[in-house]
């Protein structure tokens, strides 16, 4: 909807801003009912620079109640001031993922996240740059925890032991856990590996450590799923 495919810090509308409500010549939606729409995955849905456009985004989500919309944010402390008037206890078709990269971020953002009226909540431990303990935040509200390392040539190292620690916390609380991607620099068994971007998801899946991830768990972004907007 907005953001940039080139630079994630640049906030602008993309050509796909209104993709969820675009129609074909026969009047049917181009985005089929039941689709999962990943929203602002190259940016942040709650950027202040995008405030003027967000009303239209909420309206599209409401209009397309036959689709699920999923966005991540590290600005969860802005959500309450950005919600539409008819939000109530949340739109049933909107999933919100709160990102945390270290313990400081987790301890600040997650209490706010848990206090907000959201129907579907996930925690995104990404880019994971240190070992974190989120066990006290793993309430029944949390539908999934997903963990990923950092991508890019200047990416910081992600230690596999940090991933395993998060997994253990989730298992103890019976919260679904997904190891989404390794990141570019991945430390395992005392050795640091450089993993090309195109292999990071596949390498994470090879670890085989996902817990209770299935049809009822929060969806993952894949190359086959069309991004809406930004």
Residue locations for each model-derived region?
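Histidine/lysine/aspartate-rich catalytic loop segments that bind and position anionic ligands
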Residues: 98-106, 111-144, 149
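Auxiliary Fe-S-binding modules of radical SAM enzymes
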Residues: 129, 135-230
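Conserved Radical SAM active-site core
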Residues: 1-94, 103-106, 132-139
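Structural preference for beta-strand elements that scaffold enzyme active sites
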Residues: 36-38, 68-70, 93-97, 120-124, ...
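A general structural detector for well-ordered alpha-helical segments in enzyme core domains, enriched
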Residues: 53-60, 109-112, 162-166
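Anion (oxyanion) recognition and catalysis
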Residues: 62-65, 117, 164, 171-172
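Active-site beta-loop-alpha junctions enriched in small/polar residues
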Residues: 42-44, 74-76, 99-103, 126-128, ...
